[in-house]
């Protein structure tokens, strides 16, 4: 389903729960078939990049379809519309899902309910208010008629102009648009001009005015809901990402659970702190108890689901959990340790050293200059690299990255078929059929750095497929990369 310009969705709301929480991978065949069907129309890209166990499985399924269901009408030539395919598991970059976005479209999704690009503009009973402990009066909200906004750039040009902008710029843009409408002097038109205006432009102007009113109302609601919290969230989230001020960060989250607890956003802060700086046994139990006291023990299963999905790291036991913060000033004298996330993020340059000085030309502006989404890093690297070897060198910190497509297909002359691989497979070995590990290709790349002649990428277009869903901030970051390249 097309939700917006250059944005497609399978619209399976239960997909994430089934695949990541319940560990049921039966829907991956639907993902592979959707790509298989698309390639019947566009042709296959020259090179595939997969990141994550689920993405690797999808690439393998595509290769099985190639061998089993190959038909004459599937073009064997490379696609003239898509230069490369990136498939990435959602759990490879959970941080982009947990951070508070700074773009207009991202904040819309924070405050309002959005379903298939239809936004419920209910300013009295927003999604944000529904998540508070003191729930709003539901009866009054149910009787009022709500406005529905369609977040589609093809039908709402104004939304297309402001959707990826930093929220601080949106009100000034809307103000300038309102002044332009006010300056139009319809009274000065003659009879013929008036008839022409009514026949051709009146409906468009009326719709434009309504869209303008809706966007102004949405902005006012965002400001009223987020104004007091946005700056503190920005500072704490940036410190978490850069592994700074662990004690202050936990205090901030702990106070949030005590005074301003939210059924969703509080869990996001807890998960972000857990993934970036870790939680001790005591800290973990403190936050869990406060959440259950606020919302009830019927939500105890939520924490088990978060652990299963990889969003939350549960400390094993009190004996094995080392609470560094309890050692007082000693923690300040210890050398700073880095988690695997921070080590990889620094190598990939995802954490700008000066977030406050980042402009809109950097993809990190979508998170207030604090973090560049992994999808944007992948796209930028693939679009700017001159050879395959250069691209893989830049992406070397991603240990789970694999390659498929024509680059691997050219190496299959005389290789085993899938049935031969299955018959010869050994216990505890990993089956690589549709994609190959980067390390296994390193020797070949030394003799031929541009193996398969896939780089520089032509055409310069990349299809990004996120298994588990993508958010508006990541889309905005990829849009910055598209503009720059």
Mark where each language-model region is.
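Extended, well-folded catalytic/binding cores that form a central cleft or groove in large enzyme
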Residues: 1-485
């Amino acid at each position: 389903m097309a939700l917006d310009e250059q944005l497609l969705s399978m619209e399976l709301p239960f997909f994430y729960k089934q695949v990541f929480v319940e560990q049921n991978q039966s829907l991956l065949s639907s993902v592979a078939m959707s790509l298989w069907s698309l390639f019947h129309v566009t042709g296959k890209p020259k090179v595939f990049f997969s990141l994550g166990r689920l993405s690797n499985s999808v690439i393998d399924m595509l290769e099985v379809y190639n061998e089993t269901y190959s038909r004459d009408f599937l073009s064997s030539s490379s696609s003239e519309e898509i230069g490369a395919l990136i498939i990435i598991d959602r759990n490879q970059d959970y941080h982009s899902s947990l951070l508070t976005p700074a773009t207009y479209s991202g904040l819309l999704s924070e405050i309002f309910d959005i379903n298939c690009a239809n936004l419920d503009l209910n300013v009295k009973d927003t999604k944000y208010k529904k998540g508070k402990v003191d729930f709003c009066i539901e009866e009054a909200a149910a009787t009022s008629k709500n406005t529905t906004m369609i977040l589609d750039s093809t039908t709402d040009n104004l939304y297309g102009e402001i959707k990826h902008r930093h929220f601080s710029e949106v009100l000034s843009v809307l103000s300038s648009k309102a002044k332009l409408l006010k300056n139009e002097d319809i009274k000065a038109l003659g009879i013929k001009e008036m008839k022409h205006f009514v026949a051709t432009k009146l409906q468009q102007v009326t719709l434009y005015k309504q869209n303008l009113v809706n966007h102004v109302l949405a902005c006012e609601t965002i400001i009223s809901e987020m104004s007091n919290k946005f700056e503190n969230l920005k500072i704490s989230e940036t410190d978490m990402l850069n592994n700074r001020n662990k004690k202050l960060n936990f205090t901030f989250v702990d106070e949030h659970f005590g005074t301003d607890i939210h059924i969703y956003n509080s869990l996001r802060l807890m998960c972000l702190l857990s993934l970036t700086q870790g939680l001790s046994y005591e800290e973990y139990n403190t936050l869990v108890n406060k959440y259950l006291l606020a919302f009830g023990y019927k939500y105890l299963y939520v924490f088990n689901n978060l652990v299963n999905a990889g969003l939350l790291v549960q400390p094993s036991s009190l004996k094995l959990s080392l609470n560094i913060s309890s050692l007082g000033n000693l923690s300040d004298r210890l050398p700073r340790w880095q988690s695997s996330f921070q080590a990889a993020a620094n190598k990939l340059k995802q954490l700008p050293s000066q977030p406050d000085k980042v402009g809109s030309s950097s993809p990190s502006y979508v998170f207030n200059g604090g973090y560049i989404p992994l999808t944007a890093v992948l796209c930028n690297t693939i679009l700017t690299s001159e050879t395959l070897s250069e691209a893989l060198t830049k992406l070397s910190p991603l240990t789970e990255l694999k390659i498929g497509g024509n680059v691997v297909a050219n190496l299959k002359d005389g290789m085993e078929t899938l049935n031969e691989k299955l018959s010869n497979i050994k216990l505890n070995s990993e089956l690589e059929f549709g994609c190959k590990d980067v390390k296994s290709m390193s020797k070949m790349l030394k003799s031929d750095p541009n193996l398969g002649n896939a780089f520089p990428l032509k055409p310069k277009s990349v299809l990004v497929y996120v298994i588990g869903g993508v958010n508006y901030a990541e889309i905005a970051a990829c849009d910055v990369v598209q503009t720059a390249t």
